[in-house]
């Protein structure tokens, strides 16, 4: 049996608080934390619409880069460097030109710090990205890091991907709080981000000083923003949106993410998605940089790749050429033009060379890039023979192109070849900002700020809370409703009886107070040594649920490392949105809420009785009344055991007040004010 332990209550009284003179509006915030660029959108409750938080220069996006400025010697600071993120960081790099203290594309290194195969994962990153990453050991634990150093021969400081992301997020936060108060926050991640990558994103946000954010999937955010606009502009209704299946094709600077988003019954679901953590515009930049570096070496003998500063300058130049070329081709009829873009590049002192790029050469250099896009799409639509069963593309109503790299003409051609040009919807869709806008709307949705006709429930999150049975029939949630899939959660418990030899972990999904009223999943048993008093064992229970509804349950005795585990299937994964909605109505219904309140009163009375039964309380009761006091406590316990399930809440509240008054009489001459001991929940 699982039973809650004694929890101390802390009361804080605020007196004479000053009047709030902060006139900034409280807003719902959405952040698209991108590999190359990030964007901030806020939903204003007063205007009932979103707006973007612009940079000081008026841009809607911010470079996801960090430049470490060297501090003056002898200033007493722990670090020799100061982090400068976003546009100021990029401008400082352009002015000072030190590539060894300039960092970009670090999103690809997020969330691999705690992996057992960390060395193998880092090698994969090195193969797929031109970012100087390595593994170091800190306190006996391996972690991913980058080197900050003035020159290759100097000593270095290290910085983690999470720390770099936190610098970007802190810069974004500074921009937000200039004009707004943060009422709630959503940060988007690729649909295929795993639990570790999600946790790393949350960690970076908290390091930046944000409240713990909601984490949401980028394709869902884009689809939400799109359907919201259709409803708001009167182009369609919420009911008509229910028949809409959207393919979100999100090709950004560092990641490729493609998802099918279905709407049904007011729910937004992601039944199928795919992606590649190492495919995006940065790969195109890599290909162009290598091509022109080889050209410069063969023409002049100068090796650009041996000089990090020159290499990074070349990379910036070819990125500009890429954009100019793609703009020219997109403007041409049928995107069939083969323009030529030329730029002069200074590579060695004052020496310069003219670089030229045609669309034909551009596509030739990126043939493998296009092939990998097609392969991902084929896997998504045709299936991979494993968990992904494929998706009938004829069911897709429209395709949204999201991310800056969808401006590459050949990428547009590929999408049109797959779905047909008539299904690509671009009117009013800003590929750079739609994800952030959707994130802000989702935050507003979670805060109940949207009109009823605009609200959408997403089902790419846990639809009903997942938990275990405690206190004989209490449902204790371990993974809460709304958690991003895949999701995991762990809570620690202890035993309810002396010399307990095993504990049974019963798992259900729902959220109703009474465990038996929820949807039963399964159970496991964990063996214990059996020679320990109640409250001594430490038992960690972990629940995990993946995007396909598979549930993993594990219980570990932390004192001897014994464990039990098993896999189950979620019945909820096969429920219709209407069935889930009806269950949610029961969770928020009057009957369940009354039971929650009643159980809380029962819990308080149980805690008071347990406290009165403890040796500490027996010691302070005078001998002449000790027998009467202990009999009174025992009588109250017997009453509670008999009536806690059948008596109404008001009767238990009366008994709690009666017991409290009775104990005060017994202890009126004894010492008082002993603090309750905080304990773990009990198994």
UniProtKB/Swiss-Prot annotation:
GO terms for cellular component: cytoplasm. Disulfide bonds: none annotated. It comes from the Eukaryota. It is found in: Cytoplasm. InterPro entries: ATPase_NBD (IPR043129), Heat_shock_70_CS (IPR018181), HSP70_peptide-bd_sf (IPR029047), Hsp_70_fam (IPR013126). Keywords: ATP-binding, Cytoplasm, Nucleotide-binding, Protein biosynthesis, Stress response. This is Heat shock protein ECU02_0100.
């Amino acid at each position: 049996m699982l039973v809650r332990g004694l929890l101390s209550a802390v009361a804080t009284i605020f007196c004479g608080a000053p009047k709030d003179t902060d006139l900034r509006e409280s807003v719902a915030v959405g952040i698209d934390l991108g590999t190359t660029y990030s964007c901030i959108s806020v939903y204003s409750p007063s205007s009932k619409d979103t707006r973007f938080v612009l940079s000081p220069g008026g841009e809607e996006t911010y470079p996801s880069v960090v430049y470490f400025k060297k501090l003056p010697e002898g200033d007493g600071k722990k670090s020799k460097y100061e982090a400068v993120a976003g546009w100021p960081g990029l401008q400082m790099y352009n002015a000072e030109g030190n590539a060894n203290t300039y960092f970009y594309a670090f999103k690809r290194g997020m969330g691999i710090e705690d992996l057992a195969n960390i060395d193998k994962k880092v090698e994969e990153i090195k193969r797929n990205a031109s970012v100087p990453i390595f593994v170091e050991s800190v306190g006996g634990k391996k972690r991913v890091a980058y080197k900050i150093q003035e020159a290759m021969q100097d000593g270095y400081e290290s910085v983690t991907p999470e720390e770099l992301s936190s610098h970007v997020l802190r810069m974004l936060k500074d921009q937000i709080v200039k004009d707004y108060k943060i009422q709630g926050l959503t940060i988007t991640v690729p649909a295929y981000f795993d639990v570790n990558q999600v946790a790393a994103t949350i960690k970076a946000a908290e390091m930046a000083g944000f409240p713990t954010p909601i984490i949401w999937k980028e394709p869902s955010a884009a689809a939400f923003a799109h359907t919201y606009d259709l409803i708001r502009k009167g182009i369609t209704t919420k009911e008509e949106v229910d028949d809409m299946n959207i393919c979100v094709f999100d090709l950004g600077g560092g990641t490729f993410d493609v998802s099918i988003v279905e709407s049904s019954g007011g729910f937004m679901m992601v039944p199928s998605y795919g992606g590649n953590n190492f495919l995006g515009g940065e790969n195109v930049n890599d290909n162009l940089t290598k091509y022109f570096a080889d050209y410069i070496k063969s023409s002049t003998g100068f090796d650009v790749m041996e000089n990090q500063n020159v290499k990074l300058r070349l990379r910036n130049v070819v990125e500009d050429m890429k954009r100019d070329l793609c703009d020219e081709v997109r403007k041409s009829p049928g995107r069939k033009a083969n323009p030529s873009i030329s730029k002069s590049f200074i590579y060695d002192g004052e020496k310069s060379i003219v670089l030229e790029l045609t669309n034909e050469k551009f596509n030739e250099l990126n043939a493998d890039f296009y092939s990998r896009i097609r392969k991902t799409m084929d896997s998504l639509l045709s299936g991979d023979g494993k968990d992904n069963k494929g998706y009938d593309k004829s069911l897709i109503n429209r395709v949204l192109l999201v991310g800056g790299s969808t401006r590459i003409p050949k990428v547009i051609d590929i999408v049109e070849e797959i779905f047909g040009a008539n299904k690509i919807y671009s009117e009013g869709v800003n590929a750079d900002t739609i994800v952030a806008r959707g994130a802000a709307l989702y935050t507003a949705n979670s805060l109940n700020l949207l009109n009823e006709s605009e609200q959408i429930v997403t089902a790419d999150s846990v639809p009903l809370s997942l938990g275990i049975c405690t206190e004989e029939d209490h449902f204790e949630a371990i993974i809460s409703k709304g958690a991003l899939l895949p999701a995991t959660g762990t809570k620690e418990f202890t035993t309810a009886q002396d010399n307990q030899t095993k504990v049974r972990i019963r798992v259900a999904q729902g959220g109703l107070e009474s465990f038996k009223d929820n949807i039963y999943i399964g159970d496991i048993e964990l063996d214990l040594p059996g020679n320990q008093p109640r409250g001594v064992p430490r038992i960690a229970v972990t629940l995990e649920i993946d995007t396909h509804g598979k549930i993993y349950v594990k219980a570990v005795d932390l004192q001897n490392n014994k464990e039990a585990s098993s896999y189950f299937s979620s019945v909820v994964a096969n429920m219709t949105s209407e069935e889930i909605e009806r269950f949610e109505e029961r969770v928020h219904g009057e009957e369940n809420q009354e039971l929650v309140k009643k159980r809380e009163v029962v819990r308080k009375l149980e805690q008071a009785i347990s406290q009165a039964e403890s040796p500490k309380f027996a010691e302070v009761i005078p001998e002449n009344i000790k027998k009467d006091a202990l009999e009174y406590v025992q009588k109250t316990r017997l009453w509670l055991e008999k009536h806690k399930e059948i008596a109404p809440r008001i009767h238990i509240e009366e008994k709690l007040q009666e017991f409290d008054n009775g104990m005060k009489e017994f202890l009126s001459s004894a010492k008082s004010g002993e603090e309750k001991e905080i304990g773990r929940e009990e198994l």
